[in-house]
């Protein structure tokens, strides 16, 4: 697996975060939680250097579908491992947009994540048989927080999973440093399911020291 980290490790731009994460971290997830002129200006200035320094995945905005569309237009021709979207409540509008880009870009990975609620599963129910035609970013920490079975999720969607987001939970919130039981369970999944060497796993923590510690822990088999 390729182990990555988010672009929210230190106060600073996307490029400054990439400069800090170090060589042991093999890609950076660019967290783009909204889209406005300031975000576009920063990324336009930094994108060439970002691509020289690191492989990337991209997390598109979560606030408005219009911002998702605008951000996608910016990133669609960039070199990326995977693009992640959250589902939106207007399922028809979201599905129309998702399939309009995913069917056009069949050789590139554009995936839908399971957030900290039921919306992903409700969206799959809405899609019915077409749910087999989506790529999926499996968020391990969100499944733990929602007390959903990792095993059942993987069994249902295994052929569609293109990226995993890994973090822990304290029972009230996710994106916490995982306890040893969680780490052992995650290592077991990765070992038993025989993921490829270039499969992206993003550690979704927002603290540089914790991120580097978890990278070391995951590499210590």
Where are these regions (language model features)?
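Hydrophobic faces of well-ordered beta-strands that scaffold small-molecule active sites
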Residues: 1-7, 26-30, 54-60, 81-85, ...
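Histidine-acidic metal/acid-base catalytic patches
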Residues: 1-3, 11-20, 65-74, 79, ...
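Generic N-terminal amphipathic/basic segments
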Residues: 1-25, 30-41
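Surface-exposed amphipathic alpha-helices with a cationic face
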Residues: 47-51, 98-105, 127-128, 219
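Short C-terminal domain-edge/linker segments immediately following a structured domain
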Residues: 34-39, 58-61, 114-116, 141-145, ...
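Conserved anion-binding
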Residues: 104-124
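Structural motif corresponding to the early beta-alpha repeats
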Residues: 25-96, 173, 198-200, 208
């Amino acid at each position: 697996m390729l182990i990555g980290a988010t672009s929210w490790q230190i106060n600073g731009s996307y490029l400054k975060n990439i400069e800090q994460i170090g060589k042991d971290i093999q890609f950076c997830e660019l967290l783009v939680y909204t889209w406005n002129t300031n975000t576009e200006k920063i990324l336009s200035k930094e994108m060439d250097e970002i691509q020289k320094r690191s492989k990337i995945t991209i997390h598109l905005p979560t606030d408005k579908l219009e911002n998702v569309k605008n951000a996608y237009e910016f990133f669609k021709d960039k070199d990326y491992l995977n693009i992640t979207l959250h589902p939106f409540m207007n399922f028809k509008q979201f599905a129309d947009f998702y399939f309009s880009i995913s069917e056009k870009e069949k050789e590139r990975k554009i995936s839908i994540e399971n957030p900290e609620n039921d919306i992903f599963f409700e969206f799959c129910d809405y899609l019915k048989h077409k749910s087999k035609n989506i790529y999926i970013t499996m968020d391990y920490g969100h499944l733990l927080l929602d007390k959903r079975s990792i095993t059942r999720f993987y069994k249902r969607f295994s052929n569609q999973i293109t990226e995993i987001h890994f973090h822990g939970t304290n029972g009230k919130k996710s994106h916490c440093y995982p306890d040893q039981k969680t780490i052992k369970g995650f290592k077991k999944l990765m070992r038993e399911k025989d993921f490829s060497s270039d499969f992206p796993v993003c550690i979704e923590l927002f603290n540089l020291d914790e991120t580097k510690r978890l990278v070391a822990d995951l590499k210590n088999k």
